[in-house]
UniProtKB/Swiss-Prot annotation:
GO terms for MF: nickel cation binding
InterPro entries membership: UreF (IPR002639), UreF_sf (IPR038277)
Name of this protein: Urease accessory protein UreF
Recorded superkingdom: Bacteria
UniProt main location, coarse: cytoplasm
Source organism: Ralstonia nicotianae (strain ATCC BAA-1114 / GMI1000)
Stated role: Required for maturation of urease via the functional incorporation of the urease nickel metallocenter.
Length: 229
């Protein structure tokens, strides 16, 4: 059972107040709005649900693998998989997004003194570190269970997408909350799917999301925009 201290740490990591700049990214959603693929509450809910399925196929199982390697002190494996994940980001803005957020969280870990010195040294030694790798490190450092940490990571992603949809479409606050509430079960299912993929030998990671890649590439030169991705 999650203790009060673990729950508090979990809420801290999943908080929109975490200074990693997540609010400035839409991960292709703004380009989808520009292209009219997303234009109302229903289409926004569908877009975010599909994005969560993409996350469950690669980023979420990778998060679990990174968590296990951080916990076991397998720093070479952490570095190798982190480099692989960065290389799978299909556009410059998506690479910059995960690298900036990862750097910001790694810096916070160092400033807060979270985790063992070896972990902090490994984070500091990376020229670029992705966000799932840094978040998994923080979860290990704070004693958060793997499944709880991944659920928080996934929910924070959904929450940020909802906030982006509210701003970009725009939608009312109640519509945003309906989308968020409607995806509660999907967040849990994503964690289950990720655990199954991470347990495969070799891990079953799929980066297939051509629509996101195309929209992100278009967003890089979009004339007017609110978000950095």
């Amino acid at each position: 059972m999650t203790s009060a201290a673990q729950l508090t740490a979990l809420l801290h990591l999943a908080s929109p107040a975490l200074p990693v700049g997540a609010f400035s990214y839409s991960q292709g959603l703004e380009a989808a709005v520009e292209a009219r693929h997303v234009h109302d509450e229903a289409s926004a809910a569908r877009w975010i649900a599909e994005g969560l399925a993409v996350l469950a196929a690669c980023e979420a199982p990778l998060w679990l693998l990174q968590y296990a390697d951080w916990q076991a002190g397998r720093l070479d494996a952490v570095a190798e998989r982190d480099g692989w994940f960065l290389a799978t980001r299909e556009t410059r803005e998506l690479r910059l997004e995960t690298a900036q957020m990862g750097w910001s969280l790694a810096r916070l870990i160092a400033q807060m003194g979270w985790g063992a010195p070896a972990m902090r040294d490994a984070l500091a030694a990376r020229a670029a570190i992705t966000f799932p790798t840094a978040f998994a490190a923080a979860a290990v450092a704070l004693g958060i269970e793997a499944r709880d940490g991944l659920t928080a990571y996934s929910f924070a992603w959904v929450e940020n997408q909802v906030a982006a949809a509210v701003k970009a479409i725009p939608l009312g606050q109640a519509a945003g909350q309906r989308i968020l509430f409607g995806l509660h079960a999907a967040v849990g299912q994503a964690a289950e799917d990720a655990a199954r993929r991470a347990a495969c030998h070799p891990p079953e990671l799929s980066t297939f999301s051509p629509g996101l890649g195309v929209l992100s590439a278009r967003h890089e030169t979009q004339y007017s925009r609110l978000f950095r991705s």
